[in-house]
């Protein structure tokens, strides 16, 4: 009987389902953007709330919104640029590692502190452990101030390339801690890395503990006979290609030590890096109330800068290497453009006009190079080869996204905004062509990837160029308490969009909306900032007549950088919002 009742009920339900038609749901209707709170009281209204999948017939977003990340962008013109940023983030994510050594667990972007710090320009936005690797390098600093740089398993024989005082072995972990002695960039990179990490965490106590060790590292670079050339007042290194870790001597593959009787030279990138570090140390000391120390570091920085321009400047850019105890490898050192020149654009050592001259040199060489771009590791390359690498191979002339990123960022700051965007656009198209990949180096003629290093290094540089150059969001203090806001979306095809950045680890978000119209343009900035230094690029051919901030008219300064014009104003946000309307 029980079975018959259940069977009857199921049968009746089936009949009901077969005969009853589903009623259509009411048609969906999107809200009128003019009625949104973000447009209340504003004359220039945002038209398309973002994120969205389509703007009319244009697919402008993805189904699950992978554009929404730090940093991320959505535009009404299409999804390609947002997809490119997503792909670049994945390239950086792929280098994340854990290293287990001496009872510690370290989060590393690869096992080299150099790569870790260069890649921090990207991953600082989402990583939650920014200090474990830095702490290990700080804690193992040598008594004279030298830092170690890489952790490798013992059967990777990097530890055999250096003298005993440049290595520590951890046999229980089968690991080695090594300093390739001929490298001359680690001490200044540690200053940069610790400052970047602190901006995210806001941990003043941590930075105070690190500060004496960072200062000791720069003192070592500017005093030790292996590092410092007293006659020129500049840092020196063995005669390498730019910042790389081998010389033209075939023996340098297995011996990476500094031997002062071997060819030595002064490379500009080591010195612009130390100059930047000195100014960063001055800024940190000033923040902590050490005015005398801050003044001393600034004075040392200016002396170093003066020596750089006296001995290395060729009138347009810094020459590659100044040989000290040997003849130049060829006749082209004074005209050789090396990758550290792109970095120098962003180390505050050049005036605006000097930056423009450097950018002009890259643009001119783009027209004459046989390669597909001007993103040189070095140009001209050494011929017939450098330690077995012919022209165009590895750092002897291959093309690099890290040069592209630094060059683009520098271009945005010196009135070459359209060129900066052109570089980013070319990179984005390469990423799309290669199914979301970006490689460490490329053959200049064929465009094929060469490998030889971490792709994330270049991806992070490009992300940084987008974040601080194109989007123009610069953290001037800690956790975005003070922001320089210098967006350059006016040189892109994106008339309306949204940009997101921030620090996941400290739960800080910067959310930017923009739109360009016939009557003017508008930026809506929501952030943790207590003060905002606005520097808003005006579209070419337009003249700004008025500025409103949060609906109220405000005085502004019209500044000029090259041929570009900017609306400048110092603003105190209201409830986390600074809303800029600029009228023509």
Write out the residue ranges for each language-model feature.
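Sec-dependent N-terminal signal peptides
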Residues: 5-14
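The feature captures the catalytic groove of carbohydrate-active enzymes
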Residues: 26, 39, 104-105, 152-189, ...
